[in-house]
C-alpha cells in the first residue's frame, strides 16, 4: 500500500474496500458500492461510495462529527474532509469487515432524510433532487 503512494506529501485520505460480515465475523459479500478509482468530495453525490470505517483521514484534516445528525454524521464528515484534502488515495485493499446490520440500517428512513439535508447543503437542492430521482429510477429498473 505504501509503495503505491506517489509524490512526497502524504495523501489527505486513504480509502479502500469493505467486506460485509455476519455477527460471527464470517464473510457474507463485498459491499455493493465499491470504492471508486478516483474519489473527490463530489463523488458522494452518487451516495456514500466508501464506508467511513474504510476512510482514513490525515490527522491535520480531522474535525469533529456534526452531532446535529444522529444517523448520517459520517456522511457529512467524509464530505467535509474530502473538501479539505489535496490527495485522496485508493489503497485497492479491503480495509474493514463491516457488520451487516448497523444503526443506519435500523433507522433507514431517518438516515435518508438526514442524507438529503446533508447533500442539499454540500451540493445544492436542485442537484440533490436530480440525483435522488436517479436513485429512484435505478431502484425501479433493477
Predicted regions and their residues:
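Conserved donor NDP-sugar-binding/catalytic core segment of glycosyltransferases
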Residues: 1-28
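Alpha-helical elements of Rossmann-like donor-binding domains used by nucleotide-donor carbohydrate transfer enzymes
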Residues: 1-4, 76-80, 114-118
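Generic structural signal for secondary-structure transition and capping sites
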Residues: 10, 86-87, 124
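Conserved nucleotide-sugar donor-binding catalytic segment
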Residues: 16, 22, 29-110
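Catalytic core of nucleotide-sugar-dependent glycosyltransferases
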Residues: 94, 105-130
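Charged phosphate-binding loop/patch that engages nucleotide di/tri-phosphates or the phosphate backbone
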Residues: 128, 132-142
